[in-house]
Design a protein with these regions (language model features):
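Structural preference for solvent-exposed beta-strand-turn elements
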Residues: 1-440
Length: 440
């Protein structure tokens, strides 16, 4: 499936984006482990998160769909999961497989895990190493560093204090999930803060979680209690709508009910630094469900100034960098992105892909080992470009096509179903017509 994108001069209106992918995964997994029933509203019904639903069902958890994005999960409770009767296929979802390995590290049975071609190339050693220290057996390709993997957990994992080599919410979360059944407190220390959705949600499910400082988290083992979870809109999906609203000449775009957890709002900080016209209005009342704040975000075009994105900002916007790169090409000055080598092991090598595909559209991107430099003041030229099967690349290239000279074709665009299945409908509604058409 390809996207054919024609340039537009106007975007106007309000929209919502689908539920947060990170929070949806965690709601399903914690609901599966909890005692009692968990009701999840706003669950992201995209391919990645549906893989997590299928995975917990294969582990013996009863899941009932009550309506669009509304799921009832009858938790198995401690020791209640069962050995799956078949291989668990995680598709393209790195979050599913890495967090699931953490869950399985505390289960005394074998589970076989695999994924699609892209996921089988992605690194798993960073998760396997600490869980092996906790007592799990993890074997597979590349000495347990690539899927397919076989995981055998233990009923009582060993408590550990672990220093992660990189700031990674997935590694941290896997250790914490294994730690729920551990023989003592589990501590994770990171070199920089990463997203804290797991900690927030664990508390909502009744776990005792301590944060002595921004880089350290300690979990005390114990059972979870089922609860209600309201999933906010995904800021990583909203990023593409916001960038479109900042680029299109006559635009005024509002995105409602977006999750604005401070560990995820790096993009908003960068937009302020670039002098974007951005408004933020907090969602009324206390945070809902799992305790995640929401806001309404509004944008309209204005001259932008280049900035530097590096250091502690990177974990707070790692998934938004493809959208940010498109925006940076139009700013005044050169935008520098550093300390982002993690981009090379996402669904694609996003550093190389951005340099190559934006280059095809006439935009120069200087590739660096851990990031890129993007000179501003450039114009996009319509072209035939490749997503590489990467959902965020497909959406970034489509947004660039909205302001390109001539039509743009984005190849292999079905991958947007991974995180933002309503992407085309949302942008077409704001454009008041078919800015993006789907070619099958």
């Amino acid at each position: 499936m390809n996207f054919r994108v024609r340039p537009v001069r106007r975007l106007s209106g309000e929209c919502e984006v689908p539920g947060d992918k990170s929070i949806s995964h965690r709601a399903a997994l914690l609901g599966a482990l909890a005692e009692g029933v968990t009701e999840v509203a706003g669950y992201l019904e995209a391919e990645d998160c549906l893989r997590t639903i299928t995975a917990i069902q294969m582990l013996g958890v009863e899941v009932t769909k009550k309506g669009p994005g509304h799921y009832r999960i009858a938790g198995a409770g401690p020791g209640g999961l069962v050995e799956p009767g078949d291989v668990v296929d995680c598709g393209n979802s790195g979050t599913t497989v890495r967090l699931l390995i953490g869950v399985l590290a505390g289960q005394p049975f074998w589970t076989l895990l695999t994924g699609d071609d892209s996921l089988r190339r992605r690194p798993m050693k960073r998760v396997a190493e600490p869980l092996t220290r906790m007592g799990a057996t993890i074997v597979g390709r590349s000495d347990g560093g690539r899927l397919p993997l076989a995981v055998r957990g233990v009923a009582r994992p060993r408590a550990i204090a672990y220093d992660t080599p990189v700031a990674s919410a997935q590694v941290k979360s896997a250790i914490l999930l294994a730690g729920l059944a551990a023989d003592g407190p589990v501590t994770v220390r990171e070199p920089a803060p990463s997203r804290d959705h797991s900690e927030v949600m664990l508390r909502a499910f009744g776990a005792r979680v301590e944060r002595p400082d921004p880089l350290t988290v300690t979990l005390h083992p114990g059972p979870l209690r089922g609860t209600a979870v309201q999933v906010p809109g995904d800021i990583s999906s909203a990023a593409f709508v916001l960038v479109a609203g900042l680029l299109v000449a006559e635009a005024r775009v509002t995105v409602r009910r977006v999750g604005v957890n401070p560990t995820r709002t790096g993009l908003l900080d960068v937009l302020v630094a670039m002098r974007a016209l951005l408004t933020t209005a907090a969602h009324g009342g206390p945070p809902e469900g799992a305790g995640e704040p929401m806001a309404t975000l509004g944008v309209s075009p204005a001259p932008l100034t280049a900035t530097t994105v590096a250091g502690a900002l990177i974990p707070r916007l790692i998934d938004e960098i493809p959208a940010l790169a498109v925006l940076a090409a139009t700013a005044r000055g050169t935008t520098e992105i550093r300390d982002a080598a993690e981009l090379r092991v996402k669904e694609s090598d996003r550093i190389a892909m951005l340099a190559r595909e934006l280059g095809t559209m006439g935009v120069r991107v200087e590739e660096r080992p851990d990031g890129m430099a993007i000179p501003g003041g450039q114009r996009f030229r319509g072209a035939r470009v490749a997503s590489g099967g990467d959902h965020r690349m497909a959406m970034a290239l489509a947004v660039a096509g909205l302001v390109a000279e001539g039509e743009t074709v984005v190849e292999d665009a079905a991958c947007v179903q991974t995180s933002f299945p309503t992407f085309v409908d949302t942008l077409n509604a704001l454009a008041g017509g078919e800015a993006i058409t789907v070619e099958r």
